[in-house]
């Protein structure tokens, strides 16, 4: 028998949410960085003067991992069953928070990678496409921000299942 009030399996789901947030968002960041980085390298052969201007998708993809880190830290600081009760509701709230942020980051990373790869290659041939590429990348990044916001809201719901 455990020595804390609450459910014994609840912290498992909470930590699973923290891991999901970090793992999935970093997978999206890695995919976006790799895919758009290949496009930058390919474009750099044709137009080396545009390389620094074309690393915007790589930077935007890298930011996605930070969103997952933020949610993972918020979740993990909320899990302390020794000081206060941690119930299944809390674990599920943290799991859903991590999945919302992580899967949104994964999908945004895929979008940034594909758009960034095609965008920097097209920018080498037609510089007028740069603004359009940046706008599309911003909308893809907004997907991850939506996941971050929903993740923060869901993780703040943990602890509201009871009156203490």
UniProtKB/Swiss-Prot annotation:
Family annotation (Pfam families): ATP-synt_C (PF00137)
GO CC entries: membrane; proton-transporting V-type ATPase, V0 domain; vacuolar membrane
Residue ranges of the TM segments: 10-32, 55-75, 95-116, 129-154
Coiled coil: none
Annotated localization: Vacuole membrane
Function: Proton-conducting pore forming subunit of the membrane integral V0 complex of vacuolar ATPase. V-ATPase is responsible for acidifying a variety of intracellular compartments in eukaryotic cells.
Quaternary context: V-ATPase is a heteromultimeric enzyme composed of a peripheral catalytic V1 complex (main components: subunits A, B, C, D, E, and F) attached to an integral membrane V0 proton pore complex (main component: the proteolipid protein; which is present as a hexamer that forms the proton-conducting pore).
The protein's name: V-type proton ATPase 16 kDa proteolipid subunit
Species this protein is from: Solanum lycopersicum
Organism taxonomic ancestry: Eukaryota, Viridiplantae, Streptophyta, Embryophyta, Tracheophyta
